[in-house]
Every structure is written in structure tokens, then in C-alpha cells.
Amino acid sequence: ITRRLDRFEDEMQFEYVRGFEDFVKNIREKGVKTAVVTSSNVMKMKNVYAKHPEFKGYFDEILTSEDFDESKPSPDCYLKAAKRFGLTSDECVVLEDSFNGLKSGRAAKMFVVGFATTNSHEAIEPYSDTVVDDYTGLSYEGIMRSLGQ
């Protein structure tokens, strides 16, 4: 089973959600620190890097399952990311598509943008401050407005 799972992950394409690259470039130009906080392990992330060598360059930090004691939906992973940047929860924004990730961001008391990429708007709305289909239309300015800044 493990070999089949490894082969499946090796063959995954890890396609970006529409608008991702433009969005992350936009917020980084504004000086926003960025992190990936994933329940995936280092080996799975190596598959992502193999398919998208530029991926690491989009982020200041990449935290994998090896970096935290409790997995999502515990807030631990997001709180550790905030701590690495010297930030408080109210200074952070979580972008998530999974139920456990959304719950984790909520439990960390961060602003949560839910992506309706694998689940419906209605399903993730209770766990999100706002729901979007993809990164198209998301911007630094729009998020700052949502935060009241």
C-alpha cells in the first residue's frame, strides 16, 4: 500500500490554483511575509519542488508535518508560523481549502480565506471569514480592506 501511495504521489501534477502566482507575487511586492503550513511531510513536498522548482522561492517559510507536534485542526501549526515571523494571530491571514485547515486557522484566531476548490462555498463558509473560488481577484489591497486596514 505504501509503495502504491508513493507512486501515486510521484505522479501527481500539483497544479497551482488559478491566479496563485500573480497573487503571491503581488503580496510579496508589498513586503508581506509568506509561509506554507502543510500537513504534508518533507518527502511529499520534495515531489512538489520537483514539479515546481520555483515554488520555494514564493515563500519565506515552509512548515511541514515534521515542524509541529499537533496536526490540523489544532492551531499549533499556524501559531508556530506566526511565531517564526514574530506576529500575533490578528496580524495573520490563513488561505485554506481543507476542512481541517480551515478549522485550524479559526482555532488560531486568524482571518481565514476559504477556497471552494474541493468543497462547496456552503460547506466551508461556516469555517471561513470569506470564501473564494480561486486566487483571481484576490489582492493585498482587498485583504487589507477585509481586515479593516
PLM regions and their residue ranges:
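Asp-based, Mg2+/Mn2+-dependent phosphohydrolase catalytic module
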Residues: K25, N41-M43, N47-Q149
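Short, basic/glycine-rich phosphate-binding loops at helix/coil junctions
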Residues: I1-D6, F59-I62
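Short, acidic loop-to-helix structural element flanking the phosphoryl-transfer center
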Residues: R7-V36, V42-K46
